[in-house]
Amino acid sequence: MSGKSRRVYIAPQLIVLALIIACAGCSNKSYKADTPSAKTFTSPDDAGNSLLEVAKSGDQDAVLGIFGPGSKEIVFSADPVQDKATVATFVASYEAMHRWRKMPDGSQILLIGADNLAFPIPLKKNESGQWAFDIAAGRDEILARRIGRNELAVIDVCGALADAQAEYFSQRHNDGKTKHYALKFISDPGTQNGLYWQSSEGQPRSPLGPLVAFASTEGYKAQANSHVPFHGYYFHMLNRQGSHAQGGAKDYMVDGKMVNGFAFIAYPAEYGNSGVMTFIINQDGALFQKDLGKTTAETAAAINEFDPESGWVPVEE
C-alpha cells in the first residue's frame, strides 16, 4: 500500500452532528407499526420534555408516538449500537442546555448543548393551537446527517483496516514460515489468523487493537464470524483483484494464504438510511466509492474482487 499512514481517529463531532432520536438499540422490545398521528403538545417546552423522557425510557413505541406516521424508517437506523449512542448523546446535550428558536414561518427549532446544535425535526402549531413535530419536514436533514456521519467514519475505518493489514504482513503469525495478510477481521480463539486477537504476554500486539478498543467504547463487540454493522456499514474481505486494478487481475491467495495483496468492501447495512456509497480499498491504499443504488445489499454481497471499473470514483483525502 502507499506510504501514507492513517490514524485511527473518528472525530467526536461526527457523532454529535447526528443528534436524532433513533433508539433501535435501547430496548429488546419489538415495536409496532407507526401510530396513527403524531403526539401533540401544549407548548414547545412540553414537547422538549416529552422528547427527553422517551429518549431516557428506551420505549420504542413511545418514540414512534412522538413523531407519528412515517417516522419508523426515518428515526430507526440499521445499527442498534450506533442508535443507542446517539440517544445517549442527545440526552446529555439536552440536559446540559436547551432552548427553542422561533423561525420565520412560525415553527420552532430545538437547540441543544453548549454549541446550540439544531434538532433536525421542527415543531409546528396546528389549527387547534397544539404543537407537534413535523417528521416530513425533518426527514431529509435526518438522513443527510446520519449518512454523512457514517460515510466519513467508514472512510477512516477503511484506512485503518488497510494499515492493520500492512502491519500484520510485517510479522509472522501462527508459526508461519512466510509473511501473508490476515484472512479475516477477528481471529479464531487461540490463533492470529485475523487482524484482531486478545493480547497476551510475549506475543505481538494485534494490528486492529486500537480500532477495536475505540469501537468497544461505543458498545461494539469483537466477535469472530459475526455479521453486524459498524457505523451503519458491513465490511467484507476480498481475495482477488480484477483487470481494472493497478497491476491487473490476480488472485491474492497462494496455498491457502493471502500473499499477493488484500482488499475490503464496505457497504451500507440499509441503503439510503445508514449510508449511500459503497467503498472498496486494496493493498495500494486506493480507496474508491460508488453508489450501487437500491440493490446495494445484493450487488455488494456478490462482489468478490477489487475491480474499480467504470463508475467507481477515487475518494479524495
Question: What function would you assign to each model-found segment?
Answer:
Residues 2-15:
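Bacterial N-terminal signal peptides that target proteins for export
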Residues 21-25:
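C-terminal motif of bacterial Sec signal peptides marking the signal peptidase cleavage site
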Residues 29, 108-152, 159, 286-290:
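Short beta-strand edge/turn micro-motifs at domain boundaries
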Residues 59-71, 178-185:
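Short, well-ordered alpha-helical segments enriched in acidic and aromatic residues
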Residues 71-119, 224, 228-229, 236, ...:
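Surface-exposed, charged secondary-structure patches
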Residues 168-273:
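Flexible, glycine-rich surface segments
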Residues 260-317:
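C-terminal soluble interaction/assembly domains
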